[in-house]
Amino acid sequence: MEALRSTKLTKVYRKSKGPALDSVDLEIEAGQIFTMLGRNGAGKTTFLRIASTQLMPTSGTVSVLGLDVVRDAKQLRERIAITPQEAETIYPLTPRDHVLLNLRMRGMPKEEAKRRAQEALDELELSDVSDMNSDWLSGGMKQRVIVAMAIQTDAELIFLDEPTIGLDPLNRRKVWEQLTKLKKSGRTIVLTTHYMDEAEALSDNLVIINRGKVVASGTPRSVKEAVTLRSTRVDVYDRFTQSELGRYGRVSTIAGRFRVLTDEGGARSLGEEALARSATISMSPVTLDDVFVDIVGEAEKGEESET
């Protein structure tokens, strides 16, 4: 069943040089975790704001849970939840107050809201600070409070804009566990992130957006397979110049070393040449991070060549 569909969705802000979203077509199936990747300003947050009825599109349409986000906005808001990127806790409320009040405002009975709030605080390890003034919390704790407010609702679809930003690796994984649990219960989650490991670990499907356009979409595996001609990553530490490495694949410079994305044959040839030169290299499979840099870099080069 379809949870979200956008058709030629376009958003142009006043005085902007170009569209924030440029004719974006997306389909998101119900009961999955769908991730949006892109650089800052790529259009991810704009998409989430339109899909969650917070922003009007310039043109095109979006339907969420079968409802039009413009025509049926009021009805839709009762069935979705969102954690916006700019969300903040409120003085002098406690973490418990935040979660409890949010659930009550959505119409949840008092006793059930109390139980749900406590569950969220326990699962995200906020119990010890549950009755503390939110202004005294660390940035990571505040972020977990914001996430707890969304995931404990009965919303059928939850939008999360960079939900784990500012969290340490352990607490990021705790949020991942909760999102996976929500998916297993049949809920749909649409999130944005800059963490490629997060996208790879959580996503059923993902999309890469660059300058308002979709430049890649599919499962994490299929998106990586989109660069099958460069399936191996070779880091070269010495004894080669960038131009010499160019014949093996695409070359970039990272932290003082060259990184070559190549195919298996190219990696084999480069390995033999490195052995002959006594060069230091390391090889590993291409990651989603490599693919993101590769795809976005290619898209931007293409746009530059057109201007």
Over which residues does each language-model region extend?
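A short, flexible loop at the N-terminus of ABC-type nucleotide-binding domains that lies
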Residues: 1-6, 11-23, 72-73
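Conserved ABC ATPase signature
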Residues: 92, 133-140
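Short, charged/small-residue-rich alpha-helical element at the C-terminal edge
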Residues: 229-302, 307
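Catalytic Walker B motif of ABC-type/P-loop ATPase nucleotide-binding domains
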Residues: 158-162
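ABC transporter nucleotide-binding domain
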Residues: 176-263
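A short, proline-enriched helix->beta-strand linker immediately N-terminal to the Walker B motif
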Residues: 152-156
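Conserved ABC ATPase "signature" region
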Residues: 100, 104, 111-129
